[in-house]
Amino acid sequence: MGNGLSDQTSILSNLPSFQSFHIVILGLDCAGKTTVLYRLQFNEFVNTVPTKGFNTEKIKVTLGNSKTVTFHFWDVGGQEKLRPLWKSYTRCTDGIVFVVDSVDVERMEEAKTELHKITRISENQGVPVLIVANKQDLRNSLSLSEIEKLLAMGELSSSTPWHLQPTCAIIGDGLKEGLEKLHDMIIKRRKMLRQQKKKR
């Protein structure tokens, strides 16, 4: 799944291991954002309560090429009253992780609205988005193709690289693979921006 980023290159091999990336975790309330964050940090399930403001953690992740990368995550509350604050956190971000509840069909339209709203902000144009389809372990979860259709992923700006990743945050399935895809997209974008600067 994704829009033209299947030709992942070996840019990763040239990346210094000390590099840090600013990542914002967004999504509706109860989608599993904080569960994703703490599963990545502690590699175990942490029982969480709804986030009233934000959580922030620096997490070192070893990617498939054995390089260790630091992600500075900002997990922002998803309640409706907190969503106007999202744009403050996405300013100058390297990537967005948007978590959706694969079981909650009734709120998928609401998730679509918020996803499209945040990616259309001028400062977020071109920022890579990892859509985390959480709770894929549940029998009544939507398929990836259904989620892609309900979120109208094809209607995102052509300048917005994205990847839809099936996950189960409770046991951690799919999270590392998703981060690797996000990392690839970020590196690809940075390379493109550097090339554009040289042409000026």
Curated annotation (Swiss-Prot):
GO molecular function, one term: GTP binding
Domain of life: Eukaryota
Keyword vocabulary terms for this entry: Cell membrane, Cytoplasm, GTP-binding, Lipoprotein, Membrane, Myristate, Nucleotide-binding, Nucleus
InterPro entries: P-loop_NTPase, Small_GTP-bd, Small_GTPase_ARF, Small_GTPase_ARF/SAR
Subcellular location as annotated: Cell membrane; Cytoplasm; Nucleus, Nucleolus
Posttranslational modification: Myristoylated.
Residues annotated to bind GTP: 27-34, 75-79, 134-137
One Pfam family hit: Arf
Family matches, as CDD domains: Arl4_Arl7
Covalent lipidation (N-myristoyl glycine), chain numbering: G2
GO CC, alphabetical: cytoplasm; cytosol; nucleolus; nucleoplasm; nucleus; plasma membrane
One biological process term in Gene Ontology: brown fat cell differentiation
Family per record: Belongs to the small GTPase superfamily. Arf family.
Assembly and binders: Interacts with CYTH2. Interacts with KPNA2; the interaction is direct. Does not interact with ARL4A.
Primary role: Small GTP-binding protein which cycles between an inactive GDP-bound and an active GTP-bound form, and the rate of cycling is regulated by guanine nucleotide exchange factors (GEF) and GTPase-activating proteins (GAP). GTP-binding protein that does not act as an allosteric activator of the cholera toxin catalytic subunit. Recruits CYTH1, CYTH2, CYTH3 and CYTH4 to the plasma membrane in GDP-bound form.
Cross-referenced PANTHER family: ADP RIBOSYLATION FACTOR-RELATED
Name of the protein in its database record: ADP-ribosylation factor-like protein 4A
Classification lineage: Eukaryota, Metazoa, Chordata, Craniata, Vertebrata
Gene, per the UniProt record: ARL4A
